[in-house]
Amino acid sequence: MERMKQPGEEKNMYSIAFYEKENGESDVWDFLEELREKAATNKDARIQYRQITLYIELLQNNGTRQPDNITKHIEENIWELRPGNNRVFYFYYENNTFVLLHHFRKKTQKTPQREIEQAKAERNDYLRRKEAVKK
C-alpha cells in the first residue's frame, strides 16, 4: 500500500507519495507521525511538524518553482525540501507526482554525500519496483 496525498479539487497541482522500503516502512511518514504525536507536549516538535508539512504543501502546490530556501536541486533528479535544519529528499515521478524519500537533520554546511547516495538508492529502488509492477 503506497501512502499518498492526492491533489484536492483545483488547489494542488501535484501529488505527494512517500517512499516505502520493501518492509513497508517510510522514513518521512514515520518521522512526521512521531513529530505529530510529540507536538502536543513539545514545542520544538510542533514547530518542526508545521514547517515540514507547510513545505510539503508548497511542493504540492508549486512544484520546484520556488526559492532555494524552500527547495533546492541537489544532483540528477534529486531535490531537497529545506524546512529549518531538516532536509527531505525527493524526486519527480510520472503523472505530476513527487516522491518523498527520506529526511535528515542538517548539522554541516554541505549536504553529506552519504545522504545523497542514500536518496539515489531509494529513488532507484522505487523506480525498479514500479517498473516491476507495470510488467
Question: Which ranges hold each PLM region?
Answer:
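ATP-dependent carboxylate-activation loops
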Residues: 101
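Basic, Lys/Arg-enriched alpha-helical interface segments
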Residues: 1-85, 95-97, 105-135
